[in-house]
Amino acid sequence: MPIPMVIESTGRAERAYDIYSRLLKDRIILLGTPVDDNVASLICAQLLFLESENPEKEIYLYINSPGGVVTAGLAIYDTMQYISAPVATLCMGQAASMGAFLLAAGQPGMRFALPNSRIMIHQPMGGAQGQATDIDIQAREILRLKDRLNEILSRHTGQPLEKIVEHTDRDYFMGPENAKNFGIIDRILTSRKDVEKDGK
């Protein structure tokens, strides 16, 4: 599917933007795909660029993602925490797996979901092949990442670590209300006016 273009007129000049670049002008980043290394590089670059433009102004990360590669997601997560600009997160459609992790990692008080979105958390998945010693090494690394993700999710949601471990043992689906009660989001939005009341 071709990327839509937007034409803007300023005085006598016209300028064409692809839709994602136009959204970036409004400090909006869209994560609408599975998370892999290429996507993570693009998201991180946009976060760093927007921080350099204005380190105090909010950045809005819209999420509709089934999740993806854990290390790629952690690159986005670490960049969100590293930059000084606050990052608001908003789930539209679904935020599953690493998508839900990034949703929860938004600025406290600025983590949103639309009414018909869904959120899913679970433990990281991985496949290993090769010699027995290599499989053992990879299995231990997956367990290390699982523990680390659970610790981070516990911190951002305010849930006890034991509860995070229990609920991520299998796919755990939530609607917006349950996600709010769980601490993954702060508010459910029904219209843009709900955000504009807070200054955006």
Curated annotation (Swiss-Prot):
Q: Which reaction does it catalyse?
A: Hydrolysis of proteins to small peptides in the presence of ATP and magnesium. alpha-casein is the usual test substrate. In the absence of ATP, only oligopeptides shorter than five residues are hydrolyzed (such as succinyl-Leu-Tyr-|-NHMec, and Leu-Tyr-Leu-|-Tyr-Trp, in which cleavage of the -Tyr-|-Leu- and -Tyr-|-Trp bonds also occurs)
Does the record's keyword annotation contain Hydrolase? yes
Subcellular localization? Cytoplasm
Q: Which InterPro entries match?
A: ClpP, ClpP/crotonase-like_dom_sf, ClpP/TepA, ClpP_His_AS, ClpP_Ser_AS
Which SUPFAM superfamilies is this protein grouped with? ClpP/crotonase (SSF52096)
Broad class of enzyme this protein falls into:
hydrolase
Keyword match Repressor: no
GO BP terms: namely: protein quality control for misfolded or incompletely synthesized proteins
Q: What is its EC number?
A: 3.4.21.92
For this UniProt record, give its keywords in alphabetical order, as a comma-separated list: Cytoplasm, Hydrolase, Protease, Serine protease
Protein family membership: Belongs to the peptidase S14 family.
Subunit and interaction comment? Fourteen ClpP subunits assemble into 2 heptameric rings which stack back to back to give a disk-like structure with a central cavity, resembling the structure of eukaryotic proteasomes.
Name of the protein in question: ATP-dependent Clp protease proteolytic subunit
**Which organism does this record belong to?**
Oleidesulfovibrio alaskensis (strain ATCC BAA-1058 / DSM 17464 / G20)
